[in-house]
């Protein structure tokens, strides 16, 4: 009888289930059933085995049966008794057995460290004895490698394994045997490579094992699956384990691994809650079934920890670890212990015990330093323990190898954002360091957004949008802030989350800053609707914000709100400032009253920098000249007494120095020129001081850009202005950009910027000045490219600017300047047309320029009559008028006559060319018709010829078919001749006769014989009934002997001889009576 593990489709592995022991005194046999008859104490068998002098194999078979039934200690005891019976070399295999038995015991999960070490020591001692008897036996070699493996000496095990395999191959080579791979050595090598984390090499060996021995135990499919799992191919891993379980349903390792795969699939591949519930429920059910049979398996216990954690039973998670897993930790793989410790860390974290959580995460990393989740947990506990710098270091080290991890980018972004927002950190760090913190936070959070959106099936955490918006606000990039805050709003609306009041308020603020007052007002009102009447402070703030948005469109309403707010809360400084500002801006308050109010406000709040800044602005913009000096004094006092870093005071003083520098620059006095340079330097120093305090202060940055531009350093000025535009896209910034482009002679870009200002910022006050600047840009471009059209564009803009000043006083210097420009443009257009080639001008253009010249002369006369006009000397103006009335006018009239004659000539030439072209077209059409007709006739002729050829070919085919039929009939008659028997009798004679003929005379007969043979074979295939022929004297066929002989001779003949004898062969055919025709 045999015990077999049957695997469908493969041969079975079998162990003996019974043993027959012969009795020494008789020929009888004593049978032992190895399944049921094994005694609990192996000494009961010793008497029988010793008295009957049983062979060593009987002892080993019984011991092996004990081991197969889980009684390894009894098997060891039996073999130890056998050592007393056998001596010398017979003990070799016994020691080998004991080695493997002790190695097997050392793998037990419930052993202590001391017990495991004892078993390994016993295995080592027995292995030494076994090697002493037989060092080259493969069983001893494998045991040596296995011993190294269990002690964790993987490098030594690999090295030893390679040496043993080489020695075996060398022995095979010496013996003349073919070396074959040893499955057990391959299995050990695959396991060692896996432990060394060389998963690809390990996978290849496991696959090789599967090919060599598909029923090998342990199943290579489990190793294949483990390698695939480590190589991030979970689908192939699960398939491998499922196949192993299918072949052996009792394989515990395979069933546990399949269960792990089910848990993973339920979390990663569930498309909705329903599928997750079904998959997770099935996994839990399978866990329950497997755990009932393997309650001490550490992997299953760790899975139970996972289940209880998600259930919220954190104490049970900790109990499983401390009371069950920790007891057998020496026998558990480190990766399993690491996972179990990790869940303990999470449980402590959930219970709020962050110190113990930190310890458990550290313990998890000690067991497996690659445990990513444990590293994340460690960093989070550091945050909870207020170790922010340490947590950043932890996460940054983790980021080096996990850049694409969404959660890691989110955490790092939030940590750096927290440092950027922290007021204490801001005070103790420089502006550059603060900017670096901001940039790092944005880098990580924007990468988090990119990674999350790329998945297309995950929602972004709305807080990420909020923080990014806030970070861009610190950089004064309000448009970008608005974009991200709007995305946060969309996200909240999508998940139907109640929108916080703060989000609506901030959105409104960003819309206000970007100039969309209507949208801002609407959002402020939405926010106010969410506030209860009891929350008075929030209500007042929103009322103030609503008033700010209505200042442009409804000043009365804004003033009313400010008055209400200040009456209820007199200490609301911002409302009082805005109220006074509106009154002053609309001239609703007398200067003396305004001065009194401002002084009262300042006296009550002398140290308030907002009020001091407003007071400085008032002094600067009041009509009294004395206030300019007061403004300077006031700003200096602010810097000296109250705050040396006040941005408004510093910028105001810097602006003053710029004004002084400009005035000195106009003077021709060298001292004034030197004073101008010093003033510019002082202004630069003040602007730079502001930027040190606030790196994103756009007013200081624009001041620096203006100084660079006025110093002809246009490149740096342009770069700064572009950055300022990104933060504050207002009219001044765009105009300054246009000025720089104009100075750099990039007229196209300058024109584009001026036109953008006109479209985007519809400011009636500045529109005429911008139109004049736009005309100037077109004029500069026209001079460069010598284009009349560009002069016309410049003229159109200048005229539009002049029309907008109809209501202004005629004494305005700006109007005089524009009129002069218009007159000058008319003269310039006339001069350009006069000098241009007739090909590039028209009669109408010259006529228009004559009219324009008249208009220009009128404007010059008008300006000449004005006493206050002093742009150019009167004498020069009179010379221009005289030049226009005489030389210019007569030159234009001549140009007009020349142009008319030129255009008449051109018109005549065009008409003549058109006629010639039409005639050529008609001729060409005639040629084309002729060619088309010739082509058609040719095609018809070809078609007719083709048809005739087809008819002739058809006739030839029919004739050939008729000839073939007649030839076939003749062949049938010759084959059925009555002379067949006579011909058969003469075969030997003819053969001898023909062999004596010359080669020339036999050549034709060989060819004819070959032809006849073909016809004979055809007849055999047709299988027709032969009829007697009436053609006497002819034979129906040639003999096979003749054909064979003639074939041999034909192969020896040369091609030249064959060609020479063709005619002779034909004559011989007629003479010979051989049946050929």
Curated annotation (Swiss-Prot):
Molecular functions per Gene Ontology: RNA polymerase II C-terminal domain phosphoserine binding; RNA polymerase II complex binding; RNA polymerase II-specific DNA-binding transcription factor binding; transcription coregulator activity; triplex DNA binding
Residues in TPR repeats: 56-89, 138-174, 183-216, 218-251, 298-332, 338-371, 373-405, 421-455, 462-495, 501-534, 540-572, 664-697, 699-731, 732-764, 768-801, 830-863
Domain of life: Eukaryota
PROSITE patterns linked to this entry: TPR, TPR_REGION
UniProt GO cellular component terms: Cdc73/Paf1 complex; euchromatin; nucleus
Keyword field contains ATP-binding: no
Keyword vocabulary terms for this entry: Activator, DNA-binding, Nucleus, Phosphoprotein, Repeat, TPR repeat, Transcription, Transcription regulation
GO biological process: DNA-templated transcription termination; G1/S transition of mitotic cell cycle; mRNA 3'-end processing; negative regulation of mitophagy; positive regulation of transcription elongation by RNA polymerase I; regulation of transcription by RNA polymerase II; regulation of transcription initiation by RNA polymerase II; regulation of transcription-coupled nucleotide-excision repair
Composition-biased stretches (Acidic residues): 1042-1051, 1063-1077
Predominant subcellular localization, coarse grouping: nucleus
Stretches with biased composition (Basic and acidic residues): 959-980
Protein's UniProt keywords contain Transcription regulation: yes
Note: Present with 12900 molecules/cell in log phase SD medium.
Subunit structure: Component of the PAF1 complex which consists of at least CDC73, CTR9, LEO1, PAF1 and RTF1. Interacts with SPT6. Interacts with FACT subunits POB3 and SPT16.
Protein's name according to its UniProt entry: RNA polymerase-associated protein CTR9
Natural source organism: Saccharomyces cerevisiae (strain ATCC 204508 / S288c) (Baker's yeast)
Lineage: Eukaryota, Fungi, Dikarya, Ascomycota, Saccharomycotina
């Amino acid at each position: 009888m045999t015990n077999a593990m049957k695997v469908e489709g493969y041969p079975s592995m079998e162990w003996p289930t019974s043993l027959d022991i012969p009795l020494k005194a008789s020929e009888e046999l004593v049978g032992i059933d190895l399944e049921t008859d094994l005694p609990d104490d192996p000494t009961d068998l010793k008497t029988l085995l010793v008295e009957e002098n049983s062979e060593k194999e009987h002892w080993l078979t019984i011991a092996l049966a004990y081991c197969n039934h889980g009684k390894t200690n009894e098997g060891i005891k039996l073999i130890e008794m056998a050592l007393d019976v056998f001596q010398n070399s017979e003990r070799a295999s016994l020691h080998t057995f004991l080695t493997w038995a002790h190695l097997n015991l050392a793998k037990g999960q419930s052993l202590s460290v001391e017990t495991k070490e004892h078993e390994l020591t016993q295995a080592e001692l027995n292995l030494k004895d076994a090697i002493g008897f037989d060092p080259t036996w493969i069983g001893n070699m494998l045991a040596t490698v296995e011993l190294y493996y269990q002690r964790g000496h993987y490098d030594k095990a690999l090295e030893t394994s390679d040496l043993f395999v080489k020695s075996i191959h060398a022995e095979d080579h010496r013996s003349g045997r073919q070396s074959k791979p040893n499955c057990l050595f391959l299995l050990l090598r695959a396991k060692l490579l896996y432990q060394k984390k060389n998963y690809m090499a390990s996978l290849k060996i496991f696959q090789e094992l599967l090919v060599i021995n598909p029923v090998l135990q342990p199943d290579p499919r489990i190793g294949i699956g483990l390698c695939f799992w480590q190589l991030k191919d979970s689908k192939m891993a699960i398939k491998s384990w499922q196949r192993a379980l299918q072949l052996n349903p009792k394989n515990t390792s395979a069933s546990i691994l399949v269960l792990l795969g089910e848990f993973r699939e339920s979390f990663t591949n569930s498309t909705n809650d329903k599928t997750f519930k079904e998959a997770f429920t099935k996994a839990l059910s399978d866990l329950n079934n497997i755990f009932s049979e393997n309650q001490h398996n550490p992997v299953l216990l760790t899975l139970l920890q996972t289940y209880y954690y998600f259930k919220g039973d954190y104490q049970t998670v900790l109990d499983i670890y401390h009371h069950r897993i920790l007891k057998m930790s020496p026998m558990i793989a480190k990766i399993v212990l690491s996972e179990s410790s990790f869940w303990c860390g999470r449980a402590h974290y959930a219970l709020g015990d962050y110190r113990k959580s930190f310890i458990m995460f550290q313990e998890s990393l000690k067991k497996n330093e690659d445990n990513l989740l444990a590293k994340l947990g460690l960093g989070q506990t550091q945050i909870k323990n207020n170790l922010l710098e340490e947590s950043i270091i932890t996460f940054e080290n983790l980021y080096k190898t996990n850049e694409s991890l969404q959660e890691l980018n989110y955490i790092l972004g939030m940590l750096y954002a927290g440092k950027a927002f922290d007021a204490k950190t801001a005070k103790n760090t420089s502006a550059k360091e603060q900017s670096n913190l901001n940039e790092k936070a944005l880098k990580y959070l924007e990468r988090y957004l990119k990674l999350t959106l790329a998945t297309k099936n995950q929602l972004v955490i709305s807080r990420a949008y909020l923080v990014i918006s806030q970070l861009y606000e610190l950089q004064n990039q309000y448009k970008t802030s608005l974009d991200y805050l709007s995305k946060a709003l969309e996200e909240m609306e999508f998940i139907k989350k109640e929108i916080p009041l703060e989000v609506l308020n901030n959105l409104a603020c960003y819309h206000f800053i970007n100039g969309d007052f209507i949208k801002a007002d609407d959002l402020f009102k939405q926010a106010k609707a969410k506030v209860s009447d009891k929350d008075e402070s929030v209500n007042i703030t929103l009322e103030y914000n609503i008033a700010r948005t209505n200042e442009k469109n409804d000043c009365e309403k804004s003033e009313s709100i400010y008055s209400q707010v200040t009456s209820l809360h007199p200490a609301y400084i911002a409302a009082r400032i805005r109220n006074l500002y509106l009154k002053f801006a609309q001239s609703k308050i007398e200067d003396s009253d305004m001065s009194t109010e401002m002084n009262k406000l300042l006296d009550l709040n002398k140290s308030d920098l907002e009020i001091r800044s407003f007071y400085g602005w008032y002094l600067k913009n009041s009509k009294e000249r004395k206030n300019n000096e007061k403004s300077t004094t006031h700003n200096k006092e602010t810097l000296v007494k109250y705050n040396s870093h006040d941005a408004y005071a510093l910028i105001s003083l810097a602006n003053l120095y710029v004004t002084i520098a400009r005035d000195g620059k106009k003077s021709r006095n060298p001292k004034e020129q030197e004073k101008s340079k010093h003033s510019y330097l002082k202004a630069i120093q003040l602007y730079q001081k502001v930027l040190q305090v606030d790196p994103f202060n756009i007013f200081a940055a624009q001041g620096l850009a203006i100084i660079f531009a006025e110093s002809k350093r246009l490149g740096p000025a342009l770069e700064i202005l572009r950055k300022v535009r990104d933060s504050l896209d207002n009219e001044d910034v765009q105009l300054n950009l246009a000025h720089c482009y104009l100075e750099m002679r990039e007229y196209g870009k300058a024109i584009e910027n001026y036109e953008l200002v006109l479209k985007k910022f519809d400011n009636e006050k500045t529109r005429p000045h911008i139109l004049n600047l736009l005309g100037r840009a077109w004029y500069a471009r026209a001079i460069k490219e010598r284009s009349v059209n560009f002069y016309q564009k410049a003229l159109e803009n200048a005229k539009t600017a002049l029309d907008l000043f109809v209501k202004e006083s005629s004494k305005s210097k700006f109007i005089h300047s524009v009129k002069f420009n218009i007159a000058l443009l008319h003269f310039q257009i006339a001069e350009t047309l006069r000098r241009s080639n007739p090909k590039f001008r028209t009669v109408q253009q010259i006529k228009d320029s004559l009219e324009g010249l008249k208009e220009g002369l009128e404007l010059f006369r008008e300006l000449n009559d004005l006493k206050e006009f002093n742009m150019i000397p009167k004498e020069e103006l009179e010379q221009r008028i005289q030049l226009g009335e005489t030389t210019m006018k007569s030159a234009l009239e001549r140009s007009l006559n020349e142009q008319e004659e030129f255009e008449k000539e051109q018109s005549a030439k065009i008409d003549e060319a058109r006629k010639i072209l039409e005639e050529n077209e008609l001729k060409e059409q005639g040629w084309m018709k002729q060619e088309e007709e010739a082509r058609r006739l040719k095609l018809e002729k070809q078609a007719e010829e083709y048809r005739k050829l087809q008819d002739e070919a058809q006739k030839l085919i029919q004739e050939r078919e008729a000839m073939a039929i007649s030839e076939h009939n003749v062949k049938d008659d010759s084959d059925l001749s009555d002379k067949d028997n006579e011909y058969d009798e003469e075969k030997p004679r003819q053969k001898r006769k023909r062999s004596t003929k010359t080669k020339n005379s036999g050549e034709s007969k060989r060819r004819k014989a070959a032809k006849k043979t073909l016809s004979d074979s055809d007849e055999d295939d047709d299988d027709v009934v032969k009829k007697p022929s009436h053609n006497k004297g002819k034979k129906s066929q040639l003999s096979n002997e003749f054909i064979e002989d003639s074939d041999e001779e034909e192969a020896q003949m040369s091609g030249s001889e064959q060609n020479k004898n063709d005619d002779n062969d034909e004559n011989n055919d007629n003479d010979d009576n051989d049946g050929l025709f």
